Amino acid sequence: MLAVRSLQHLSTVVLITAYGLVLVWYTVFGASPLHRCIYAVRPTGTNNDTALVWMKMNQTLLFLGAPTHPPNGGWRNHAHISYANLIAGRVVPFQVPPDATNRRIMNVHEAVNCLETLWYTRVRLVVVGWFLYLAFVALHQRRCMFGVVSPAHKMVAPATYLLNYAGRIVSSVFLQYPYTKITRLLCELSVQRQNLVQLFETDPVTFLYHRPAIGVIVGCELIVRFVAVGLIVGTAFISRGACAITYPLFLTITTWCFVSTIGLTELYCILRRGPAPKNADKAAAPGRSKGLSGVCGRCCSIILSGIAMRLCYIAVVAGVVLVALHYEQEIQRRLFDV
């Protein structure tokens, strides 16, 4: 089960999710139908040596093309939407228009669907980065619970492992017998981990030399994190090419705001060293609850943080899948149909 316990990691996940939703909204609903495609045009009557000019659909000009004869013998993926607004050249009643109208009649030689480029580059990179960051969060939480962590106050007690609690509930309710093997195993693991953390903080180089597997695990965790953040930040640096003329200014501003905020948040999380907690004896409450109320409180907290969170994740994933399946045809129609 994945539960984002760190507020810093949760903020990054929320920012990446919001960034992806903004891109999906613009791709599906926000783009004007006249600003979806760009065309490589040349004014009618000019020589074939004249350089092609990329422009978006302009209602003051007449675009001539050949929608029934795809370029290079076949359509590009979803390129038919770009040729839908063109006029077939053979229906124009004159072969060579007057000089006064030459500059208002354009021959289209190529068309590009810019929403297709946005959908298959930026949106995909954001989705991959989102899953990679969740993978990093899962690896980091497992390392905090079972692995070597420095500083030591970041460690999470292995006894809080959900499988341990579930095993005790099943054994006590159904088997009517206390099951403590997992608890004893986790206690032994906690003691051994304390010793490893002390050795690591004393001499990290020698520790990693004699235990390279731990270094590989930590390295994989860091690589996954940097790759995820790199993919998200890299979406702002993808060359837009000629499609830049179709993207509005607010999309550029929104992209840089999200990317810079995510990058600065991750940089702050890496550089920030949280203060060590106060002494447990001083921080402990003088009147710690005991008896039935304490047991019920601990059980309720474990249930809410474990089973309830699992149900929430299942509900969210199921909701996303149902919405995607329900609106799949509508999204495809808005993206790639006329």
Curated annotation (Swiss-Prot):
Family: Belongs to the alphaherpesvirinae glycoprotein K family.
Post-translational modification: N-glycosylated.
Gene name linked to the record: gK
One of the Pfam families matching this protein, by short name: Fusion_gly_K
Membrane topology (Extracellular): 31-121, 234-243, 323-338
Subcellular location: Host cell membrane; Host endosome membrane; Host Golgi apparatus membrane
Glycan-bearing residues: 48, 58
Protein's organism: Human herpesvirus 1 (strain KOS)
Membrane-related topology note: Multi-pass membrane protein
GO terms under cellular component: host cell endosome membrane; host cell Golgi membrane; host cell plasma membrane; membrane
Protein name: Envelope glycoprotein K
Principal location listed in the UniProt entry: host cell
Topological domain spans for side Cytoplasmic: 141-212, 265-301
